A protein has these predicted regions:
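ATP-binding N-lobe of GHMP and related small-molecule kinases
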Residues: 1-94, 114, 118-123, 159-162, ...
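DPxDG-like acidic metal-binding loop motif
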Residues: 68, 96-122, 127, 138
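Glycine-rich beta-strand-to-loop/alpha-helix junction loops that act as flexible
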Residues: 100-101, 241-246
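Generic non-transmembrane alpha-helical segments
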Residues: 1, 70-78, 124, 128-131, ...
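Conserved, helical-rich catalytic subdomain that frames metal- and/or nucleotide-binding sites
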Residues: 141-142, 146-238, 253-263, 268-271
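Short hydrophobic/aromatic beta-strand micro-patches
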Residues: 249-251
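Glycine/threonine-rich beta-strand-loop-alpha-helix active-site module
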Residues: 117-156
Length: 271
């Protein structure tokens, strides 16, 4: 079975409070990016082994710790399925805040549900995905969602992006860990929620829709801040860092002219 694991962007990211379990309550809007994805081939095999091959972008991670393998192992533990062969063509940059690894994990759960005819509902697959990451359940539904709690409490939301252009830019030599992102943030309660703000014209988003990680990440990684400024210089109506970074995105009325080089990864698509 061939499956495309689409990545996502975050429109706004409010860090509301630190919880007793060590996680943070957040509010964010996740939007799928249809044209930027990892390609994964999944097949059932005899026995109970998990075979994993990876091509494309090189990720310095032992196979047993890869989210694809962890997702397959979770499905074996819960449902007693047989072996699984996974071939991952990695195209989504990692350490970017685009959810590439989470999308891969969810794709494995969805694929195994189909090839082993488990009959799981989307709700059940989302519960399983939540065991592998806070944003992982989003990729079961693959539609715009406002996400609360750790990110796993999701409600569909209309985001007026159809027909507009999206540019995703990641500095290749800059990565931001989740620990670094949360380590420098001060939780706060915003005056206006994202559900209200995203319903305003996109030209107004710059005034109110923010990513709470940006101030300290930009201070520690000036190159990331420079890319956001570049997106506005190129004519973006709205630009922001996605998730915990280091990727940024810009929303444009017309196709922007942004070229990639040895220093940056660039993806452009019409939404």
């Amino acid at each position: 079975m061939q499956i495309k694991a689409h990545c996502k962007i975050n429109i706004g990211l409010n860090i509301l409070r630190r919880r007793e379990d060590g996680y943070h309550d957040i509010e964010t809007i996740m939007v799928p990016v249809r044209g930027l994805y990892d390609e994964i081939e999944v097949a059932a095999t005899e026995g109970d082994s998990i075979a994993f091959e990876q091509s494309g972008i090189v990720v310095d991670c032992p196979a047993e710790k890869n989210l694809c393998v962890r997702a397959a192992r979770l499905m074996q533990e819960r449902y007693g399925i047989g072996g699984v062969s996974i071939k991952l063509d990695k195209r989504v940059p990692f350490g970017a805040g685009l959810g590439g690894g989470s999308a891969d994990a969810t794709a494995i759960i969805v694929a195994i549900n189909e090839i082993y005819a488990l009959g799981l509902t989307k709700e059940r697959m989302a519960e399983l995905a939540a065991e592998l990451g806070s944003d992982t359940p989003f990729f079961v539904y693959d539609e715009a969602m406002i996400c609360r709690g750790r990110g796993e409490v999701m409600t569909p939301i209309e985001v007026p992006l159809r027909g507009l252009w999206l540019a995703v830019v990641k500095p290749m030599n800059e990565g931001v860990s989740t620990a670094e992102a949360y380590g420098g943030v001060t939780p706060r309660l915003p005056e206006r929620g994202l559900e209200e703000l995203v319903s305003t014209p996109i030209s107004k988003w710059r005034e109110g829709i923010v990513n709470d990680f940006e101030p300290h990440i930009f201070k520690a990684h000036p190159r990331i801040a420079e890319i956001k400024a570049m997106l506005y210089d190129k004519g973006a109506t709205y630009a922001a860092m996605s998730g915990s970074g280091s990727a940024l995105f810009g929303i444009f009325e017309e196709r922007p002219t942004i070229t990639d080089d040895d220093d940056t990864f660039v993806h452009i698509e019409q939404m």
